[in-house]
Amino acid sequence: MAGKEEIIAKAKDSITEFDEEMAQEAANEALVAGLDPVEIIEHGYTAGMQYVGDQFEQGTLFLPHVLAAAEAMKAGIEVLQPEMEKRKAKTTTLGTVIIGTIEGDIHSIGKDIVASMLNIAGFEVVDLGRDVAIKTFVEKAKELKPDIVATSALMTTTMVNQIQLEEQLKEAGIRGQVKTMVGGAPVTQGWADKIGADIYGESATDAVNKIKAAIKS
């Protein structure tokens, strides 16, 4: 039987090699070995995704590579999902997070990773998908009364819609009842401060840690 480090390395390699089958194999090996799915995802898949993201930023990999890596990660997580749900059922939910890619933006890679990691961390995650209308975020926030409403923007042209969300949550009279988080490649702490968002998620891990801290406070 493969050891823990070996399985984690295989999970990471499956992402950097864009290999969905290998990602599923690593996940199955992890389950057989009784490993914690969170470890496999954080140290294996997410570490691989981080590497791919860095290479993409440096211009050595391109969008099709990032998409292929994201598909491999998705394939691996799907295998681990039932075990994660089982473990999650035994623990209390930390809070509810509504997440989606903002209106006009069809990119979902970063958002998908954050949603997966929040799920793993023990949050109830309502993923609205990509290119989500502002009014949908507001309606869902009214209906579900979440702790956090998180939006991702991958383009400077769609970032402005994060301002619209802040405004419309205020108009609906619920801005004071939820905390907002913004993230995405062009988004910065300065932007979050400027529009009045509560949290800026620089990376998936950063987003999870800050959401945990925000809910405790």
Swiss-Prot record:
GO terms for molecular function: cobalamin binding; cobalt ion binding; methyltransferase activity. The keyword Ion transport does not apply. Methylcob(III)alamin binds at residue 107. One of its GO terms (biological process) is methanogenesis. CDD domains: corrinoid_protein_B12-BD (cd02070). Can form a complex with MttB. PANTHER family: METHIONINE SYNTHASE. This is Trimethylamine corrinoid protein 2. It comes from Methanosarcina acetivorans (strain ATCC 35395 / DSM 2834 / JCM 12185 / C2A).
